[in-house]
Amino acid sequence: MNKEEFINKIHGGLIISCQALPGEPLYTEEGGIMPLMAKAAQEAGATGLRANSVRDIKQIKKIVDLPMIGIIKRDYPPEKPYITPTMKEVDELVETGVEVIAIDATLRPRHDGKTVNEFIKEIKTKYPNQLLMADTSNFEEAKNAYEAGVDFVGTTLSGYTEESPKTDHPDFDLIKALVDAGLPVIAEGKIHTPEQLKQVIDINPAGIVVGGAITRPLQIAKTFTSVFEN
């Protein structure tokens, strides 16, 4: 799938992120739960998916035929990047045939010692036809990653790094600035409500991802149970 085909499939619809990490209620060693989430997402009208781990991606692909953004979350302390942080994770994801691979494209120090520009160049040299998405937290990071060769820039990490504003809502200003700059933006992060989604739609990015507000029942339930604590 090329860049234009991917945009045509996802634009005007919603990419739903289906993830569960160790320690979360929906995580199991053998998997099997995220494919059901993905199936529900497809039946609800999602135009794409975002998934974590080779296992989940492969299991989802067996029952759902939506285009997918794939990542591998793997910690390499003390460095902070953990979303597809090295070529090892990229190699694993390429083997799954996932349509887009997302990487941490912040300017923070990396486990492999490379700059993010060197990492992007290495990926695009090894896998020239692989679509690549940059998970970033601010305008500088996104612009840098796009100029380095990624196909899409995501606002995924805004609010989660020291280099971005701490808010409890989507970074509307960042999404708009990137769209206005002519970058292919996948808006993601802290979209909690349909009203916030509508605001993002009005900015008209190439794609939009919603995750926790749909597929993390513990997080969703807490928004209700917390009412009793106030």
Curated annotation (Swiss-Prot):
The keyword Metal-binding does not apply. Keywords: Carbohydrate metabolism, Isomerase. It catalyses: an N-acyl-D-glucosamine 6-phosphate = an N-acyl-D-mannosamine 6-phosphate. One of its GO terms (cellular component) is cytosol. GO terms for biological process: carbohydrate metabolic process; N-acetylmannosamine catabolic process; N-acetylneuraminate catabolic process. Pathway: Amino-sugar metabolism; N-acetylneuraminate degradation; D-fructose 6-phosphate from N-acetylneuraminate: step 3/5. The keyword Transmembrane helix does not apply. SUPFAM superfamilies: Ribulose-phoshate binding barrel. Its EC number is 5.1.3.9. InterPro entries: Aldolase_TIM, NanE, RibuloseP-bd_barrel. GO terms for molecular function: N-acylglucosamine-6-phosphate 2-epimerase activity. It comes from the Bacteria. Belongs to the NanE family. PANTHER family: N-ACETYLMANNOSAMINE-6-PHOSPHATE 2-EPIMERASE-RELATED. Converts N-acetylmannosamine-6-phosphate (ManNAc-6-P) to N-acetylglucosamine-6-phosphate (GlcNAc-6-P). This is Putative N-acetylmannosamine-6-phosphate 2-epimerase. It comes from Lactobacillus johnsonii (strain CNCM I-12250 / La1 / NCC 533).
